[in-house]
Amino acid sequence: MVSAILALGIAFAPVALAGSGFRSKVLRMVNATRNNHDLHMLRIDRSLSRDALRHTRRMIADNAIYDPTNLTRILQDEPWDQVGASAVGCADTLYALHHAFMHEPVHRDILLNPKLRRIGIGVLEVDSQNTCGRNWLWATELFYG
């Protein structure tokens, strides 16, 4: 069973644990999916990953899942010229999160956009009760091409 939340929440979640391994695992899943669809692999953008992590922290503090309202500002210093996009959500595993993105048409279209070149990834595990669930992963993925 795959569990994920890609919508708004209501409760409070004060504590989050970061894991540097989350970013590389998400990147591997995204690139494996893109490879399976004959698309080029994305490269990690460290500054964009910092922005993604900042947005994830903001969502956790607000205990709500939402796209960044300032995506244009976030991307203003990046070399993007064709597309800028975001995917946000939470799930009990990284696989469940990726699975949910791939089965939701808007997020799937983003992940499989052939014009994308770079990705920023911010994932945190929240160890307290919250809208998504105790020990669930909250994530922001930012893209440009």
Where are the language model's segments positioned?
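Surface-exposed patches in mature extracellular/periplasmic domains of secreted proteins
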Residues: 36-50, 63-74, 108-123
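Generic alpha-helical secondary structure signal
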Residues: 24, 28, 46, 50, ...
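A short alpha-helix/helix-coil micro-patch that ends at or immediately precedes a cysteine
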Residues: 19-62
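Short, surface-exposed glycine/acidic/tryptophan-bearing loops
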Residues: 49-99, 111
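Disulfide-stabilized extracellular recognition modules
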Residues: 90-145
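Residue-level signal for pocket-adjacent positions within structured domains
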Residues: 37, 60, 82-83, 106, ...
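Bacterial N-terminal signal peptides
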Residues: 2-11
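Sec/Tat signal peptide C-region and signal peptidase I cleavage site
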Residues: 14-18
